[in-house]
């Protein structure tokens, strides 16, 4: 059914279905992307008995992993009054302690894990054909500061976990904004790659005044 998305849990030993949960939330993508399908593109995240699923129509659903019961559901377009991403939501949810992070709702969004309430949203992508990031975020320590590292359609950005403030940013060139790779943290360095734009290694440091500084080591 093209109007619904379905998540199924299977017994690993037998392959039999344990539970199935569905919600209304499907959409069609532009014709040139249709070959990749018009269904969920992100990878679900399982953590401490809870399953977090990002649906293609910019929704985030939290389910009980044992029963499949929906604990909460956020429709970002409805709640934030943002337009749907033309290619659908692609980012996989990132769980960190009491919060969930995802590139949805026209930017990078932090939610309360227990309730689904939005804490903040940042990195406004402007929506339309250039909106809806493809990359999934990571969290790590760079230059002594724990932060989220987020690759948008156009940039690689360090984001403060408490406030959502941008800590640093570098432009990442990619054909039609197809920045898909999840960044990799190596010490105080970040590796990433883009479609048609090459591979990059950046070093993140701080000045004597405490502001962040980026240096491209190679491309």
Task: Write out the residue ranges for each language-model feature.
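Noncatalytic, solvent-exposed loop/strand surfaces
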Residues: 1-219
């Amino acid at each position: 059914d093209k109007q619904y998305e379905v998540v199924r849990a299977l017994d690993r030993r037998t392959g039999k279905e344990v539970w199935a949960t569905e919600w209304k939330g499907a959409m069609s993508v532009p014709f040139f992307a249709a070959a990749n399908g018009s269904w969920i593109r992100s990878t679900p995240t399982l953590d401490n008995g809870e399953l977090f699923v990002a649906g293609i129509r910019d929704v985030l659903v939290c389910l009980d992993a044992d029963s499949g019961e929906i604990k909460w559901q956020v429709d970002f377009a409805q709640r934030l009054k943002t337009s749907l991403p033309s290619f659908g939501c692609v980012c996989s949810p990132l769980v960190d302690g009491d919060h969930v992070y995802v590139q949805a709702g026209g930017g990078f969004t932090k939610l309360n894990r227990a309730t689904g309430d939005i804490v903040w949203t940042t990195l406004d992508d402007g929506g339309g054909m250039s909106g809806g990031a493809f990359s999934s975020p990571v969290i790590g320590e760079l230059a002594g500061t724990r932060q989220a590292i987020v690759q948008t359609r156009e940039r690689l950005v360090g984001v403060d976990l408490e406030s959502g403030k941008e800590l640093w940013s570098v432009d990442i060139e990619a054909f039609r904004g197809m920045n898909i790779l999840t960044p990799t943290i190596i010490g105080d360095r970040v590796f990433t790659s883009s479609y048609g734009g090459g591979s990059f290694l950046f070093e993140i440091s701080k000045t004597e005044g405490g502001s962040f500084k980026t240096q491209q080591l190679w491309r």
